[in-house]
């Protein structure tokens, strides 16, 4: 088999995928991340086997400015605002350790959403957003979201004296073990007032907060996706971000959900690219390639081209509309979420298919847990569970777009 030019594969995708950053800030982030890739790759097998978040690498990232990547420059960060560039950065990390990329997404996502709160949020929430962003930019705050409930609903209640208390349990909170703050999705229940949704920001040192050491997932084992228990945690009123009404669809809110989650698509593109790289390296080592192998390789590359193109297109739309508050905000939300869900549906299906085919090409050696393809095989399947919609919810959303409610 003839070895291709080093420019061949990236060149085909240069105008259609996650290949190059679109902003100088995105380039600075990629340059920073390059220094971590060798260690990530070298440690990925042990981190997977032991289900361990590489705390020492995150500590380096905190000190060297990576964890402040999506914080505005005015507040001490790198100023990466492009969703395309964030997705590209996550793809590069995921090619070495997807669990670390998933954990890193937690911090990047919070920077993006808090930046929006700071610039466009209600006057009462802007000081909180600015304070958190400054701490992130200084390397003092590591913030992750806590969304998925365990056995019931996490509830924020307000007592007659005006104080708040948080009770409940969240699961699959990636990076929770090293976080300093948690943005918690809750129901807000107040006497004499309708139930609302809220997102209290809870510090790690808050009384009643317990971070469990219970992560033993099938894949993404280096993400540190543990449970958190809230047992009467006190929350100051000025640390609560208001959200919408439970059970009421608010299409304007789809924009924020898109900004928070769309960059994760880069993780699964990065996994598929890594699987291709491993498979082609093995095929070249063996020499020769039967027709069936060549057909499979061609199909892998065609699917990767489709993934790159779909994801880059959805990210371009999201970047274009993210700060456009000039028109119908519900229409803006739908215009951001719909291409995101088209791309997510394609990524969830075809990234899995690419990894499966790469495992088939490598053969039985890849079925051993010690082989990197085995880890990618497990990691790539996490995409179907990622926010904001799983497969069935995404299908419901897209079918409503096509057929109406």
UniProtKB/Swiss-Prot annotation:
Pathways per UniProt: Antibiotic biosynthesis
Name of the protein in question: Amino sugar nitrososynthase DnmZ
GO biological process: antibiotic biosynthetic process
Keyword tags: Antibiotic biosynthesis, FAD, Flavoprotein, Monooxygenase, Oxidoreductase
InterPro entries: Acyl-CoA_Oxase/DH_mid-dom (IPR006091), Acyl-CoA_Oxase/DH_mid-dom_sf (IPR046373), AcylCo_DH-like_C (IPR036250), AcylCo_DH/oxidase_C (IPR009075), AcylCoA_DH/ox_N (IPR013786), AcylCoA_DH/ox_N_sf (IPR037069), AcylCoA_DH/oxidase_NM_dom_sf (IPR009100)
Family of the protein in this entry: Belongs to the acyl-CoA dehydrogenase family.
SUPFAM superfamilies for this protein: Acyl-CoA dehydrogenase C-terminal domain-like (SSF47203), Acyl-CoA dehydrogenase NM domain-like (SSF56645)
Function: Nitrososynthase involved in the biosynthesis of baumycin. Catalyzes the double-oxidation of TDP-L-epi-vancosamine to TDP-L-epi-vancosonitrose. The rapid turnover of TDP-L-epi-vancosamine suggests that this compound, or a closely related analog, is the natural substrate for DnmZ. Can also catalyze the double-oxidation of TDP-L-evernosamine to TDP-L-evernitrosose.
Xref: Pfam families: Acyl-CoA_dh_1, Acyl-CoA_dh_M, Acyl-CoA_dh_N
CDD domains: ACAD
MF term (GO), any: monooxygenase activity
The protein's Enzyme Commission number: 1.14.13.-
Native source organism of the sequence: Streptomyces peucetius
Record's keyword annotation contains Flavoprotein: yes
UniProt cofactor(s): FAD
Record gene name: dnmZ
Disulfide bonds: none
């Amino acid at each position: 088999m003839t070895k291709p030019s080093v420019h061949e594969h990236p060149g085909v995708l240069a105008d259609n995928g996650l290949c190059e950053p679109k902003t100088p800030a995105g380039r600075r982030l990629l340059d920073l991340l390059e220094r971590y890739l060798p260690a990530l790759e070298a440690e990925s097998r042990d981190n997977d086997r032991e289900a361990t978040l590489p705390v020492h690498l995150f500590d380096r990232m905190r000190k060297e400015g990576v964890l402040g990547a999506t914080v505005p420059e005015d507040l001490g960060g790198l100023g990466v605002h492009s969703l395309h560039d964030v997705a590209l950065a996550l793809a590069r990390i995921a090619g070495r350790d997807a669990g670390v990329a998933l954990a890193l997404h937690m911090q990047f996502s919070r920077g993006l959403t808090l930046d929006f709160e700071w610039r466009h949020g209600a006057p009462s929430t802007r000081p909180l957003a600015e304070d958190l962003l400054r701490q992130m930019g200084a390397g003092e705050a590591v913030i992750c979201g806590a969304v998925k409930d365990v056995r019931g609903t996490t509830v924020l209640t307000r007592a007659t004296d005006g104080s708040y208390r948080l009770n409940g349990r969240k699961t699959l909170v990636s990076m929770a073990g090293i976080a300093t703050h948690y943005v918690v999705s809750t129901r807000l229940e107040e006497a004499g007032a309708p139930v609302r949704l809220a997102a209290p920001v809870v510090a790690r040192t808050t009384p009643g907060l317990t971070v469990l050491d219970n992560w033993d997932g099938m894949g993404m084992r280096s993400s540190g996706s543990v449970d958190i228990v809230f047992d009467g945690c006190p929350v100051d009123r000025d640390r609560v971000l208001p959200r919408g009404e439970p059970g009421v669809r608010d299409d304007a809110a789809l924009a924020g959900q898109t900004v928070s989650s769309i960059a994760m698509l880069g993780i699964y593109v990065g996994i598929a690219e890594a699987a291709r790289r491993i498979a082609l390296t093995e095929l070249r080592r063996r020499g020769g390639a039967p027709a069936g192998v060549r057909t499979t390789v061609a199909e892998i590359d065609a699917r990767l081209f489709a993934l790159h193109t779909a994801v880059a297109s959805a990210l371009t739309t999201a970047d274009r509309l993210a700060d456009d508050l000039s028109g119908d905000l519900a229409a803006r939300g739908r215009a951001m979420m719909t291409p995101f869900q088209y791309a997510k549906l394609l990524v969830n299906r075809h990234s899995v298919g690419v990894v499966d085919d790469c495992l088939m090409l490598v053969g039985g050696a890849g079925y051993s847990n010690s082989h990197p393809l085995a880890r990618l095989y497990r990691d790539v399947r996490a995409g179907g569970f990622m926010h904001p919609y799983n497969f069935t919810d995404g299908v419901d959303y897209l079918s409503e777009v096509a057929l109406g409610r």
